[in-house]
């Protein structure tokens, strides 16, 4: 029985598990966050502590000159039985020989640079691990943990690697000609600005006005900077003429800007070419002055000659009275001289009267405007923007006044404050196209072209609406219409 019991002894299996040490934030660091800190004083916006924090040194990641491959049998060697005295002496001798040969190789590599092995070849994987069909990654280092990334911030990683390679801030790199070269920063060029062009160079070409000496208590005028977000401007044309505002945004592709008006706070979109930069003093003084926008102020500003005409007439009348009194005192002179004076007086009077009539007729009524929305016109002004839009077709988007409008080109560009004399009407080439009557009795009516007479520059138009009749109209009285039609 005893023999049978001994043969049935229990069998047990054991496994050894090696765990990697993880980088964790110690409890001491967490406790330091909650420690009390005593303040000594305050300088500006900075608080002075009784225990100032040590200055942070620049982070350095040392360069790996030679890879230290992990040994896969490291755990087995540790668990192996201790070596005898003879084996320990033998292993120590082998290590010393290997170290001595390594130093000799390093000395030879320093003396003879032609025999140096490239760094990538020195640090390559040993043979038999990753050069077969089955890749053995046992020599590879362990993957990084989250705590490893906390030690090195992402923003300082690149600079830390450069410092480990020997780079120092402010010192140039290179072997013979060391020079600190600043990195080239690319700047976005505005649309239409040619290569090599610089907008700042225009300021040096402009004639500079001589500066007057400042009076006691007078402040120097503030020089207006370039047009940008927050700049104070004045609108010189369009529906918001003579109003002040500040730039909220700029669209360089369409040459337009978003302006917040000083009066009312409304955000409007205007052309960049209708803006004038102003300084802060002018903006503060006139931005919210409503008296500038009154009709009385505008009339006195546009027509100042009206105030001076009565004075001129009084001066002329006074001169005539003085000449008459002097002539009465010299009645005793010869009749021939008296007759000559009277004739000269009548001639001078005849010469003055047409001038006075011209001054009275200076204010002429504006010509009849033929501008309408949704009509196609042709641009005929060669001087506008250097003739960029000359002889191009465009569409009238909006009519600001009887003789001014806003146009949109075929490319989608918006042109503001375009005068009527810069445009001409367009007649469709094909019959059956819609036109609008812009002048004459049927002004504003839409119709279809039935027949065109090129020799006499007129067309037979079938009008729509109440008349519904065919009329012969001149080319100057009709224009191509692209808006909605009543079928």
From Swiss-Prot:
InterPro entries: G_patch_dom (IPR000467), GPKOW_KOW1 (IPR041993), GPKOW_KOW2 (IPR041994), KOW (IPR005824), Rib_uL2_dom2 (IPR014722), Spp2-like (IPR045166), Spp2/MOS2_G-patch (IPR026822), Translation_prot_SH3-like_sf (IPR008991). Residues 65-121, 181-232, 295-367 are annotated as: Disordered. GO terms for cellular component: nucleus; spliceosomal complex. One of its GO terms (molecular function) is RNA binding. The keyword Plastid does not apply. It comes from the Eukaryota. It is found in: Nucleus. The keyword Cytoplasm does not apply. Residues 226-253, 428-455 form the KOW domain. GO terms for biological process: mRNA splicing, via spliceosome. Residues 96-106, 200-209, 295-333, 352-367 have a biased composition (Basic and acidic residues). Keywords: Coiled coil, mRNA processing, mRNA splicing, Nucleus, Repeat, RNA-binding. Residues 88-116 form a coiled coil. Residues 154-200 form the G-patch domain. RNA-binding protein involved in pre-mRNA splicing. Component of the minor spliceosome, which splices U12-type introns. Belongs to the MOS2 family. PANTHER family: G PATCH AND KOW-CONTAINING, G-PATCH DOMAIN AND KOW MOTIFS-CONTAINING PROTEIN. This is G-patch domain and KOW motifs-containing protein. It comes from Xenopus laevis (African clawed frog). The gene is gpkow.
